[in-house]
Structure formats: structure tokens, C-alpha cells
Design a protein with these regions (language model features):
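Terminal, compositionally biased segments used for targeting/anchoring and flexible tails
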Residues: 1-231
């Protein structure tokens, strides 16, 4: 089994949530907030809330869509916000631009709703990320499997979801390392196809482990070919 020159380093992560100074009582306010809030706020209400959504049974996976639905009573806008797939974004700037575009277009199409007061205000919050190296590295596929099975939900989310922003690539930490360091391109691609919206963190991890186990069995089979019986 291949040994990576650069081991995979698992990180543990925690998020500190801070309520900002901005809030929105209608769609015009929300647009101003989206244009002016910090990158940490956009991250909190999209990438970070997806982690919490994995433990819920209903509602949208980003806060802007959920507020548009539940508080502003604008179902069509909520669906347009929710249609923005965070897997398509490698920068907060690009995600912010599309959030603003969706809202501007909606306000232009339905100006009568732009200043209609919502049932409750939207409060812009920020997620401050604190990371520390986990006491576990992986140089082989076996060690990698052990690490993935061991890390917390927050760590799994950090490596599998939010890593796109850090790498500025449309992939995740796990797939990036498997392809680049172990040469397991097919495994990396299959892992990256795991849907972060239809799976919980637990089911996404379980699917990943099954894919890794299948790769390990394939390696064991190729390393121990059936020997012909002596005649």
C-alpha cells in the first residue's frame, strides 16, 4: 500500500458565534446587510449553518433562505437562495455576489415586497473559526480510514465542506490528499460526489468509510492474486 510523502493532518475545530451590529426587517435591509456584512457573517449563515442543518429534519440549509421563507413569507425568494449550492463556490466574494444578485433581481421583479416588514428581524452573526492540529496524522489509506472514523462532526465538516474555501478548489481536503498524495484519483472523485445536502454528517462519513473499505479490499485482492493449483 502506498505511503504518502506528505501525511494528511487532521484538525479539530470550534466556531465562536458573535452577533453583529446589523439586522434586517425587510428585503431592502437584507440587501444592504448582504452587501456590507463581513465575510465571516456570510460564512456563518451558509457554510456553517449547513453543519447545524444536518441535525434538523426540515427547513432550508442556509439562514437567508430560511428567513425569507419563515419570516418574510417569500417562498420563491427562499427557493432561489437555497438553490445556491455552496459546493460551487471557492470564495466568499463569489457567494456574496450571487446572494446579492438573487435578492436584487427579486426586488426588481416585486418592488411591492421590498419594504414589507418581516415577522421577525434577521440578525447577522459571525463565525470565528478556531483550529488546532488533532493528535492524528495519516500516511496510508488504513491510517486515513482510522482518522476519518475518529474525528468529531465539526472536524469532518471542516475537512469535507468548508475546505473548498481554504483550498480555493472545487473539492475537499480528503479528496485532494487522496488524489495528490496516494494517487487514488477514482476514490477521491467518488468521495467528492457524496451529497452534503441529502446526507447527514454521519451518513456522509459512513459512505466515505465504505468507499475507503472497498478500495482497501481491492488493494488486498490485487496484492494476493489467486494461485493456480499445482497439477
Amino acid at each position: 500500500m502506498n505511503v504518502a510523502e506528505t501525511p494528511f493532518e487532521f484538525f479539530t475545530v470550534a466556531y465562536l458565534t458573535r452577533i453583529g451590529n446589523q439586522s434586517a426587517g425587510n428585503l431592502e435591509d437584507l440587501l444592504a446587510g448582504l452587501e456590507q456584512c463581513s465575510d465571516a457573517s456570510i460564512f456563518h449563515h451558509t457554510f456553517q449553518t449547513l453543519s447545524s442543518h444536518h441535525f434538523l429534519t426540515e427547513g432550508f440549509s442556509n439562514d437567508f433562505a430560511q428567513w425569507a421563507l419563515a419570516e418574510a413569507n417569500r417562498d420563491a425568494l427562499a427557493e432561489q437562495f437555497a438553490a445556491l449550492d455552496i459546493r460551487d463556490y471557492t470564495s466568499i466574494a463569489a457567494l456574496r455576489a450571487d446572494l446579492c444578485r438573487v435578492l436584487r433581481d427579486f426586488i426588481a421583479a416585486f418592488p411591492q415586497f421590498s419594504r414589507q416588514e418581516a415577522l421577525d428581524r434577521f440578525y447577522f452573526c459571525e463565525s470565528l473559526e478556531v483550529t488546532m492540529p488533532f493528535s492524528l496524522n495519516a500516511g496510508t489509506l488504513d491510517e486515513f480510514r482510522n482518522g476519518v472514523a475518529t474525528i468529531s462532526h465539526a472536524s469532518f465538516h471542516f475537512h469535507f465542506v468548508t475546505s473548498r474555501l481554504r483550498l480555493q478548489l472545487r473539492t475537499n481536503d480528503f479528496s485532494h490528499w487522496l488524489a495528490g498524495s496516494l494517487g487514488l484519483t477514482t476514490l477521491a472523485e467518488n468521495i467528492d460526489r457524496i451529497d452534503i445536502y441529502t446526507n447527514t454528517l454521519d451518513s456522509a462519513r459512513a459512505k466515505m468509510l465504505r468507499l475507503v473499505d472497498r478500495e482497501r479490499r481491492k488493494y488486498e485482492h490485487d496484492s494476493n492474486p489467486r494461485q493456480d493449483s499445482a497439477g
